[in-house]
Amino acid sequence: MNTNTPAHPPEGAPLSEATQAALASAEHAPDSPGATHIRSFVHRRGHITQRQRDALEQLMGKWSVPYAPRPLDMAAAFGRQAPTILEIGFGMGETTEKIALARPGDNFLGVEVFNAGVGSLLHRIEESAISNLRIVQHDAVEVVRDMIAPDSLAGVHVYFPDPWPKKRHHKRRLLQPPFVALLASRLAPGGYLHCATDWEDYAVQMLEVLGGEPLLRNTADGYAPRPDFRPQTKFETRGLRLGHGVWDLMFKRA
């Protein structure tokens, strides 16, 4: 489950200066003038494995796209024209890898701030020879606002975002009305927004916020069944076995 908390390498053999510079935008890039938002992640030190460190060092240039405050040329980034799916907060990338492999006709752009998660997915991409997946390591709000052209996405996945369970922290939840409106504007007509959470009160908020966006319509009467393309994670399977709930929401651009 993604916590949207960027990890920092522990003390030891440092990443190269070039790699550090490539990673820095995920933590230090300023907002565009006059455009500010409450970030849905916090800066804390975290563990990163040697394999993840090696992937960051060796594979960022091959499979990642640097943040830039201008629309991304998807055809150039992927080397082909294909429907593009944006995934926000892919955690360690297990689900992202499986979906990209199962849907070779689509392009997938994953956005994450964790060094450990980015390193993990880079390794998965290389190991599984996934050609239809790219990564942007940067704040998701800025990526959507600055790099995604209006009416351009075939779909958006937001799976298990940080629930920020304390009431005073709910303002940090990713899926707030302004961001949902921004996501909806980036979807092509007929494009979908698929969210999943295992926190019931966040599911209630998601349903309210998505249902209040004029550009979106619910494809179900309330919550949706888990679509076949979203694999059930080990964490999710264990939670369901213990009686915990998982709520999927599927909305489409009108």
From Swiss-Prot:
- Single GO molecular-function term? tRNA (guanine(46)-N7)-methyltransferase activity
Q: Name one GO cellular component term.
A: tRNA methyltransferase complex
Entry annotation: catalytic residues: D162
Q: Which keywords are on file for this protein?
A: Methyltransferase, S-adenosyl-L-methionine, Transferase, tRNA processing
Q: What name does the UniProt record give this protein?
A: tRNA (guanine-N(7)-)-methyltransferase
Q: What protein family does this chain belong to?
A: Belongs to the class I-like SAM-binding methyltransferase superfamily. TrmB family.
Residues that bind S-adenosyl-L-methionine, according to the entry? E87, E112, D139, D162
Signal peptide region: none
